[in-house]
Design a protein with these regions (language model features):
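Conserved beta-strand -> loop -> alpha-helix junction used to position metal-binding or nucleic-acid-contacting
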Residues: 81-94, 379-403
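P-loop NTPase Walker
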Residues: 1-104, 220, 303-306, 518
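Short, polar/flexible loop-turn hinges at active-site or ligand-entry regions and domain interfaces
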Residues: 51-55, 76-82, 97-110, 122-134, ...
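ATP-hydrolysis module of ASCE/P-loop NTPase motor domains
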Residues: 20-21, 101-196, 294, 418
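Conserved helicase C-terminal RecA-like lobe
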Residues: 373-375, 394, 399-544
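Conserved helicase NTPase motor core
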Residues: 3, 8-19, 23-27, 58, ...
Length: 545
């Protein structure tokens, strides 16, 4: 593709970023400013200009969905061979390839879900913690946080106390006591993994780092493979991921980082915006380009989001300007009970007259979404549920996939593979994933798919890209899971004191609220029951209805 064709349709800020293809570059990209477009066009521009070869290019991001979108956009720009992966995916591919050379023997079993394995580890430790769902989720999160900071079990308690960690373990005990119990489970978990020759996703990063640092031959081969680096969502890297990036880079500086400190919402998981904020200290000759023109949201939404950040203590000076025409003012409604809030929101959605898949209900926690889901279903309104749990990691989804896989090797009864799909999924009831699988099957059959095996391959590809099949319904999502997504109409519910902000880090919760607001393109409906969140204080000119 010609250089000028790659630049077509870009605004001046985007052009500056895309054409800056030498040396270290830091792009500060606000919500809805065309970040992915800039990343992919910059890679395509560098390839077209002869600065890099597609096979020498590595683009890193944090979700398989985002990586898949990057690859698709690069293909349309004539760059089909550039590598776009998550940190974990890139590390796993290298680790599996070089394992026989660096470690010897067969590759260990990869633990894709910690739940049941943690339960086994708890049984082998002398912890007094009870392995309930909520407790296992907290322990899993703490282990992942500790390993992202490269903190051993023996150092976990001290690190957790110094970092001001808070827990939601339902046993009424002080966090300090629970930290000590988690340390026991953490040690038992690591011991059990070693005994059974199992590694988890954090180990993938740790082992790849160790391999690069200790094995000179592997290090040189990997560095020869990749020479042109791009890191998306750089505000969310952990110290372990930065160490891995250092191993890939060496002393070279052909790196472009893209991020927005105002959208740092994963410090609880070990992420830190320090690497983004200090990029020019590490690379004094680095260029910095700011993308401040917002193309997603209306001026009303952007102005409100800007005020949210200004009210904080982080002194974020990256203010966005909407490039869209003015629209509707944000709506703020108060309710005496959660149920009255649920009823009103669902009634509004039912009467909105908009495509349901263009509507999202966002909340701080999964539990807040349950009554909304029930109320929508009672009105026969389809829903899509998005949360921090990956769709294809769900036990029920994995069970359904196993059944489909078994059926795919058998000849279709009467030649009708779609009928077979419906038959094998019948025992799973009318769950959302069942309806999504069948809907996908119908659309694939209409497009010419000839076998259940074709559907299975599509589902496996989607699992690898974390791109689950969905139904065209109202999206129900936590604020964290909504990151990187957008809808025309957003209902931000349960904006109550004690829920948002939650925990001790008020500024991170402020950024989370900002992320929620900037998911909306056209309208935002804010609501709360009981005491309003401090974030709503003085937010809107008019009083709550």
């Amino acid at each position: 593709m010609e250089l000028e064709a790659i630049l077509e349709g870009l605004d001046p800020q985007q052009r500056e970023a895309v054409t800056n293809i030498r040396g270290p570059l830091c792009i500060i990209a606000g919500a809805g400013t065309g970040k992915t477009r800039v990343i992919t066009h910059r890679i395509a521009y560098a390839v077209a200009a002869g600065v890099t070869d597609p096979s020498k290019t590595l683009a890193l991001t944090f979700t398989a969905r985002a990586a898949g979108e990057m690859r698709a956009r690069l293909r349309t720009l004539g760059v089909p061979n550039a590598t776009a992966r998550t940190f974990h995916s890139a590390a796993l591919k290298q680790l599996m390839y070089f394992w026989p050379y660096s470690f010897g023997g067969s590759f260990p079993k990869l633990l894709t879900s910690k739940g049941s394995f943690l339960g086994d580890a708890m049984g082998r430790s002398d912890t007094s913690l009870v392995p309930g769902v909520a407790t296992l989720r907290e322990i899993s999160g703490e282990i992942e946080w500790a390993k992202s900071l490269q903190t051993a079990p023996s150092d976990y308690v001290e690190e957790a106390l110094q970092s001001g960690r808070t827990l939601r373990i339902p046993n009424g005990r002080p966090d300090k006591e629970n930290f000590a119990e988690i340390a026991k489970v953490y040690q038992a978990y690591e011991t059990l993994k070693h005994q059974e020759r199992i590694i988890d996703f954090e180990d993938v990063l740790l082992l790849t780092v160790g391999m690069l640092e200790e094995d000179r031959d592997v290090r040189e081969r990997v560095r020869d493979q990749y020479r042109f680096f791009t890191v998306d969502e750089y505000q969310d890297v952990s110290p372990l991921q930065q160490r891995l990036l250092n191993g890939w880079l060496g002393n070279r500086d052909d790196i472009c980082v893209v991020g927005d400190a105002a959208q740092t919402i994963y410090t609880f998981a070990g992420a830190t915006s320090d690497f983004l904020l200090n990029f020019t200290h590490r690379y004094p000759k680095a260029e910095v380009v700011r993308l401040t023109r917002g193309y997603r949201s209306t001026p009303e939404i952007i102005e409100t989001a800007n005020r949210i950040l200004k009210a904080g203590t982080s002194h974020n000076d990256h203010e966005l300007t909407s490039m869209n025409e003015r629209g509707e003012e944000l709506e703020l409604r108060s309710f005496s009970t959660q149920q009255s809030e649920v009823n009103a929101v669902v009634e509004t959605i039912a009467n909105l007259g908009k495509t349901h898949s263009d509507i999202a209900i966002l909340a701080r926690t999964n539990n807040q979404l349950d009554p909304f889901e029930a109320a929508l279903k009672a009105r026969s309104i389809e829903t899509q549920l998005k949360n921090s749990e990956r769709f294809f990691d769900r036990v029920d989804v994995r069970d359904a996939m196993r059944v489909i896989r078994s059926a795919s090797v058998l000849p279709a009864e009467g030649g009708d593979w779609l009928h077979d799909l419906e038959s094998v999924l019948r025992p799973f009831g009318n769950a959302d994933y069942v309806r999504a699988f069948i809907t996908l099957g119908k659309s694939m059959k209409e497009a010419g798919a000839t076998s259940l095996r074709t559907l299975l391959r599509e589902l496996e590809d989607r699992a690898e890209q974390n791109n689950p099949p969905t139904l065209p319904g109202v999206v129900l999502s936590t604020l964290h899971a909504a990151k990187g997504l957008e809808w025309d109409h957003v209902f931000l519910v349960g904006v109550n004191e004690g829920t948002l902000p939650m925990g001790n880090d008020v500024e991170e919760e402020r950024r989370l609220f900002y992320v929620g607001l900037t998911r909306a393109k056209r309208t935002v409906h804010l609501s709360y029951s009981g005491a309003p969140s401090e974030f709503l204080s003085g937010l809107l000119a008019s009083e709550a209805k």
